[in-house]
A protein has these predicted regions:
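Amphipathic alpha-helical coiled-coil/rod segments that serve as protein-protein coupling scaffolds
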Residues: 1-111, 124-128
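Short beta-alpha junctions and helix-cap segments that line functional grooves
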Residues: 112-116
Length: 130
């Protein structure tokens, strides 16, 4: 049936990559909180001429970099989740699975030319009579 799992790829490295991406995102979010607080403090201090305009501008620029790091971290988490989802190889159509070309525990690569198996669609069946 369509959506039925045909193969399972070891998810361990993909889980590790997802956990790493989540940790990087958490670090970036914590840094952004710190930078937001620093900019808020400097905004008051620059108005009172207690801190230089250059220091304030640097803090604002660093805040922008921290926000970009958070966005990049979110994208990395999304990518890791997508890659983890690819560890379940499912049938795209309903049909019969042909002979499997790989055995359990075999090493396969994303770029290999050999098919792992073929799914043959049985419904509808078209016949050409001549």
């Amino acid at each position: 049936k369509a959506g039925q799992r045909l193969y399972k790829i070891d998810p361990a490295p993909y889980i590790a990559a997802l956990n790493s991406a989540k940790a990087t995102l958490a670090k970036a979010q914590a840094n952004l909180v710190t930078q937001n607080a620093l900019v808020a403090r400097y905004k008051v201090l620059v108005a009172a001429n207690a801190v230089s305009k250059q220091d304030y501008d640097n803090a604002v620029a660093t805040q922008g970099q921290a926000a970009a790091d958070v966005a990049a971290g979110k994208a990395a988490v999304d990518t890791a989740q997508i890659n983890l989802g690819y560890t379940d190889v499912v049938s795209p159509i309903t049909g019969r699975v042909g002979i499997s070309q790989v055995t359990p525990g075999a090493y396969v690569q994303a770029s290999q030319a050999t098919l792992m198996s073929t799914v043959q669609q049985l419904d509808p069946v078209y016949v050409d009579l001549t």
